Amino acid sequence: MGITQTKDSITCTFLNTDHKTISAVLKPDPKAKLRKAPSSTELRAFKGKGIYGQIYDKEQNLIYVYYRSCQQDKKYPFSTFTRELLDTIANRHPQKLIIDLRYNGGGNSSIMDPLIDSLQNGYLSHEHKLYVLIGKQTFSSALLNAMSLKKQCQAILVGEATAGSVNHYGEVRKFELPYSQAIVTYSTKYFETWKGHDGALIPDKTIPASVEDFKRGRDSVLEYIYRQ
C-alpha cells in the first residue's frame, strides 16, 4: 500500500493521555493476537455470547437486548430468540426494554421485522418504555431497524448520531477472494426511508461516548436509562 518503506519495521509516533508524544519502532509479529481492553469486559454490551441475546436485570427490572449483526445464528434462529424474549416480557413484565444497536454494522434488516411487529402493540411501546441505543458503529440494516423501532414502536433513541446515513445502500452480501481469502462485502439495495433527508439518524437523547468511560468500564448511555 506504500505506507512504509520497508516491511520489516515502522516508526510510529503516539500522543498519550498527558498530551506528550512517544515514538516507538514496531515490527511485524505473525503470531500476535488482539486482546480486548480489560475494562471492556465490564461493559454489558460485550458480556453476552453470540450475535444476539437478552439479559434480565432483576434489580432494575429491565431487559437488555444486544444485537451485534443483522444475521441469523444457524444454531440459534432469531425466531427462537424472539419467542424467548416475548416470553420473558410476559413473565417478568419489565419496566424497560433496551435494544442495543450501537455495535451493529448491518446485514439483513428483515430478520428483526417479526420482533418489531410483536412489540408494536405492546405496553412497552404504548408507555414509551422501549429504548434503542445507536452510535457511530450503527450502519445499514441496523439503522433501518432503529428507524422502524422509532416509527412503529415509539422507541426512544439514545446514544450518538449514526455513522451511516438514513438513506443509504444496504442488504450487505459478501464473498471470499480465491487467492488472498480476503472477505469482500458489498451492498445490493438502496433504501430511501426518509425522502429528502440527508445525513445520520440523530438520537432523541445524545450521550457522547468517551475514552475515559471506556477505560473505566462505564456505560453512560445505560446509566442514563437506569435513571429514567
How should these model regions be labeled?
Residues 1-96:
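Flexible, low-complexity junctional segments that flank or bridge functional domains
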Residues 91, 96-98, 102-227:
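Conserved acidic, small-residue-rich alpha-beta core segments centered on
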